[in-house]
A protein has these predicted regions:
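A transmembrane-helix-recognition feature enriched in membrane-embedded lipid enzymes
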Residues: 199-228
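N-terminal type II signal-anchor transmembrane helix
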Residues: 7-51
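A structural signal for short, hydrophobic/glycine-enriched beta-strand patches
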Residues: 42-198
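Short, intrinsically disordered terminal tails adjacent to the first/last structured region
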Residues: 1-11, 235
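Coil-to-alpha-helix initiation sites in intrinsically disordered, low-complexity, charged segments
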Residues: 13, 17-20, 194-201, 205, ...
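Short linear elements at protein peripheries
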Residues: 57, 223-235
């Protein structure tokens, strides 16, 4: 007569254990799939945060950046000027080009040629050597204060609005009288929040800007100390 080895688990117990593992694995797969879907759907919104615009503000500030970015930001700011929402446009520019040309002069000619002399006469330039959004905000604060402008619409690329908004509100905090900042985002072809994973350029922008956002959220200015940039107004 054959005897069953008492060390071997009962067959029903093995089946129950296998079924339990399958359920656990299935739940893990479902959770991961749901998380991935939510990430792809809403991941682009991490970078974008715009504000409802006021009926009127003193100035629309165009932040510096890539050629495509500046062109789109300039169009957005000029549109606000034409709509009567702002009285002036302030563009952040370096003093000279690589070839020694005066950037304010070249930029004024650009505005006059593309938007007309009436628009060009309403554009002022904040001239400063900056290499980060943090430095740029500090320089532009000086230019804004020199004009007495406190109601400010900051025009930048859509993917830059959340990070730039946090930087600007920190840079202009404790001013007396206080600044009122509104963030306006424009599409420059580098990023769209919806379907951001479908194009290589959008993914590159998302990775770069998200890493900056995370870094500045954790470390602020980082382990180094930035030298404040001096901004001066040229019209």
């Amino acid at each position: 007569m054959m005897h069953r080895d008492p060390n071997l688990p009962a067959q029903p117990e093995s089946a129950a254990r296998l079924k339990g593992r399958f359920r656990t694995t299935l739940w893990i797969v479902v959770v991961i799939a749901c998380a991935l879907i939510l990430f792809l759907r809403f991941g682009g919104d991490i970078l974008v945060h715009t504000d409802p615009l006021p009926r009127h503000a003193d100035v629309a500030v165009v932040l510096n950046g890539s050629a495509l970015g500046v062109r789109a930001r300039t169009q957005g700011a000029v549109q606000l000027l034409k709509q009567g929402i702002v009285d002036y446009v302030m563009a952040s520019v370096p003093p000279t080009t690589y070839w020694g040309e005066s950037v304010p002069q070249v930029a004024h000619h650009y505005f006059a040629e593309h938007f007309g002399p009436q628009v060009a006469d309403r554009v002022v330039f904040c001239v400063a050597n900056t290499n980060s959004t943090i430095q740029e905000a500090g320089a532009l604060r000086q230019c804004l204060e020199s004009r007495g402008w406190r109601q400010v619409i900051v025009v930048t690329s859509n993917y830059h609005t959340r990070r730039a908004g946090r930087i600007w509100r920190a840079a202009l905090a404790h001013a007396n009288p206080p600044f009122k900042i509104y963030m306006e985002g424009v599409a420059d072809g580098s990023f769209q929040a919806r379907g951001w994973w479908r194009q290589r350029e959008y993914v590159k922008t998302w990775l770069l800007e998200t890493s900056k956002l995370i870094w500045e959220s954790i470390f602020g200015l980082g382990p180094w100390k930035s030298v404040p940039s001096q901004g001066r107004v040229v019209q």
